[in-house]
Structure formats: C-alpha cells, structure tokens
Design a protein with these regions (language model features):
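Conserved DEDDh/DEDDy metal-dependent 3′-5′ exonuclease domain
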Residues: 9-121
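Conserved RecA-like ASCE ATPase "motif II neighborhood" in helicase/translocase motors
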Residues: 386-396, 409-433
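Glycine-rich P-loop/Walker A and Walker A-like loops and their local beta1-loop-alpha1 context
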Residues: 241-253
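A substrate-engagement module of RecA-like helicase motors
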Residues: 190-201, 267, 272-403
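Acidic two-metal-ion nuclease catalytic site recognized across multiple nuclease folds
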Residues: 2-3, 115-190
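Conserved beta-strand -> loop -> alpha-helix junction used to position metal-binding or nucleic-acid-contacting
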Residues: 62-79, 270-275, 294-311, 429-438
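Conserved pre-motif I regulatory segment
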Residues: 187-241
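Walker A/P-loop NTP-binding motif
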Residues: 224-228, 250-264, 284-288
Length: 438
C-alpha cells in the first residue's frame, strides 16, 4: 500500500508491541528498536502519543518540540469533542480506515490520518477557519508544528484580528444561559404497562434489536409502579427490583420514565452510583433521542462541580502562557474542545483525557482536569465573571427543562437535602443501600 500526499509532512513512526515501522514517501519499512529510537530522538517524525512511543523505545518522555508531530494533537484540533483511542489503530478506526494490525500497517495508517485531517482543514468553511484561526498564530509561536502547515492553506483574511492575543479567551465566544419562567407543578398522570412496553419496543427497534425480549418487557412493566400517584403526602411509590446482567435494565426503566416526563411536563431523575453507569445510561439514551440536538435538550447528565471545566481556572492558566508557566498548546487544544463540548464535562465526558500525557509538561502547567476543574470548593457563583457562561450553571438550568436527568447518588442526595427537590428518581439498586454495582 502506498500513500500520496501534497502536504510537507515528516515520516510516520509506529511502535506497537512486536515491532517498529516507518512510513516515508508513501511506503513503509521495518525498523529495529535502536533505529526507531534514534529516529524518534532526532526527528522530525509523526507519532501517535509521543509519551507512550518514547516509553516503548526505552526513552524519557520528551518535551514538546518540532521534532515530534503528534497526530493525536492534530485530531484534537481538527475534530474537537470526538472520542479517539490514543493509538494509530484508534485514529484509523475513528477516521474510517481498516484497522491496522502490523507495525507496517500502523505507520501507513498514521501517515494517512495526518493527511486526511489536514485535508479536512483545507475544506473548512469561512466560519470554521475563523474559529481555528483565532488559535493558530499563537500555536505557531508556541512551536506547534502543524500550525504552519494549516496556516499555509488559510486566506489571510480568515485570520481574526484578535488572533494576536492567542485566541485563548474562549469564554468570550460562549453562549450565555438565560433565566426562564419557573415551571408549574408536575402532573400526576401514571404510566400504564402498555405505554411502557410500547415505548420499549420503539427504543429496541431504533437500537437495531427487533427480537422479543419478554424479561425486559416485564421489567419495564414493573417499573411503571414507581410512577403511580401518591396516596399519602410525602410517601412516594417505591419499587425495589433486581434483574440479571443482559436483561436490559437501562432501557427497561428509561421507557416508562420518558413516557411519564412527556405526560407530566417534568423531568425524571435517574440516579446511579458510578460515572461509568452514567455514561452507559447516556449512551443508551441515543435510542430515546436519536437527534443529537434534541438529545442535548431532553437528556441532561448532572455531576458535581468537580467534574466540569471551570472557566475562571482556565482563564488564570491562559494568563500564565505569557509568563511561560502554562502549556500553551494544551490550553489551545482545550479551547477548541470548549467550543465543541456537549456539556463541559472533563472527567467522563468528551474531553480527550490523553492531552496532558502526550509530552513532558510540569503538572501545574498541564491543561488537565487537576488544574481546570473546581476541586477545592472555591466557586464564587454569581460573583464569577463567567457565571453567565458557566457549564455547571448551564447544566443546572438544562436539567430543569429536560425529560431525563442522569445523575449520581451523591448529587441527588445533596440536592434533595439542601433544596428539598420533589421529583421522581428511579434508581437501579441491587441492594438496600441504593448503590449500583455491575
């Protein structure tokens, strides 16, 4: 297999377990480990995760330099907010290539990935070029090797005037939330078993699962009892149910929950124990709301503040770039993510967690959740200059008008204790403590 490219790129180095290979001028060849180590050390080379590549070759993780063109950084810049496993194979999968197996195939795939991503920048419309152009001059000054290649294809008129400031002031381009009139009291209509199983059938068809699943239908029917109107004030209906792995519990309770929310004009809170289960419920919600824009409004994930990007922390780190105490490239890639993220969740959302580990960057300079979320309870709320664009505040307000809110037990309990919220919260609890374990 050969590759033709009109971009002036260095050769691509792949070092999976079992061998090393280099793709140069469209053809790949095997390398010994010493040869690969020398090429990596001398550069320039294309790599996927410079830190891991160095460790496989027995070298120290390098500082960011023009010798190492990390295609993962290019991916984070061109396709912000999209998931990618941090390997050549991961890049190949997300870009639609055949998954490479050998080191030769991975080196070719890495070169193809860089070429495809750069070709996407050449096809951007003016709006996309302007959004990226705010950051590219600053990235070029910081020594990011892809910056000059991308800028070469940009008309000078598409580089915004504020690009000279580095473009890291991403808070200035975020939309603000607006207060809306409070909702009235929720309705009290119940959900019938027929409504729940009908909704379940719709969701299974959307998920491509057309076979009969009587156990899952029975679970969905049982869950409807949690939505019966209260007979006595402050005594909600409670259903304690258990089902084995593979039954399909998530869609089993999302089906009646979504019907209840639609009929009664109020959100249903689904509480779970772990972030992994929150992600799973959110993923399966794709069958409930296939359209991403509708899903963003109808299904909201709620977590504690320590999970979300704090714009004030980000601003403080961005100001450190001029002093040389912050990672300019990492912050620029984070700025791209801020413009594309669904909800600003850095710990389990769409933030590429591998960004801080690609190169040797001091911990206090990294664009990482450790530095960019509020872990010390120092939020000043309405006194913050970014209060109107705050991701947490947007999530709070979005949850009020959603149909399904996916939260964790800690947030739900604190929410109930301090705000006395009265909403229906079904939980998937295989033990009396209400904890979810799988």
């Amino acid at each position: 297999m050969t590759l033709q490219s009109d971009m002036p790129l260095p050769p691509a180095l792949a070092t999976p377990p079992g061998g090393s290979a280099l793709c140069e001028a469209g053809s790949a060849r095997w390398l010994t480990r010493p040869q690969a180590a020398r090429l990596f050390d001398e550069g320039p080379v294309l790599v996927a995760h410079a830190g891991w590549t160095a460790r496989r070759l027995g070298l120290a993780v390098p500082a960011r330099s023009p010798r190492h063109w990390d295609v993962l950084e290019l991916f984070a810049f061109v396709r912000p907010g999209q998931f990618c496993a941090p390997t050549p194979a991961g890049l190949a999968r997300v870009l639609g290539f055949d998954e490479p197996q050998s080191a030769l195939d991975q080196a070719l795939a890495l070169a193809q990935a860089a070429d495809l991503l750069l070709s996407e920048t050449r096809a951007w419309d003016r709006h996309s070029r302007a959004a990226a152009g705010r950051l590219l001059p600053g990235l070029a000054r910081a020594g990011w090797p892809f910056a000059e290649v991308i800028l070469r294809s940009f008309p000078e008129a598409d580089i915004p005037e504020d690009a000279r400031t580095g473009g890291l002031d991403v808070w200035t381009v975020l939309s603000e939330w607006e207060e809306q009139a409070p909702l009235g009291e929720p309705g009290t209509q119940s959900v019938s078993e027929a409504e729940a199983t009908s909704r379940l059938s719709q969701l299974l068809q959307r998920a491509g699962l057309d076979e009969a699943r009587p156990s899952q239908a029975a679970f969905a029917g049982l869950a409807t009892q949690a939505f019966l109107p209260r007979d006595v004030e402050d005594e909600p209906k409670v259903v304690l149910s258990e089902a084995g792995t593979g039954i399909g519990k998530t869609l089993g309770y999302l089906s009646p929950a979504s019907v209840w929310a639609e009929k009664n004009g109020a959100p249903v809170w689904v509480s779970t124990y772990t972030r992994a289960l929150q992600r799973q419920i959110d993923r399966e919600g794709g069958a409930l709301y296939p359209d991403p824009a509708l899903r963003a409004r109808k299904m909201v994930v709620r977590k504690g503040r320590e999970n979300y990007l704090c714009l004030l922390n980000y601003q403080e780190m961005a100001q450190g770039v001029a002093l040389g105490v912050s990672d300019a490239v990492g912050l620029a890639l984070t700025a791209r993510w801020v413009g594309a993220t669904r909800d600003g969740d850095m710990t389990g959302g769409d933030y590429p967690a591998w960004i801080p580990s690609l190169f040797a960057v001091p911990v206090n300079a990294q664009a990482s959740p450790v530095n960019l979320v509020d872990r010390r309870g120092e939020c000043v709320h309405a006194a913050c200059p970014h209060y109107r664009t705050c991701f947490v505040e947007k999530a709070i307000r979005g949850a009020r008008r959603a149909d399904v809110v996916v939260a964790n037990h800690a947030l739900v309990l604190s929410h109930a204790a301090f705000e006395h919220v009265r909403t229906t919260r079904p939980g998937e609890a295989p033990n009396p403590a209400g904890r979810v374990r799988r």
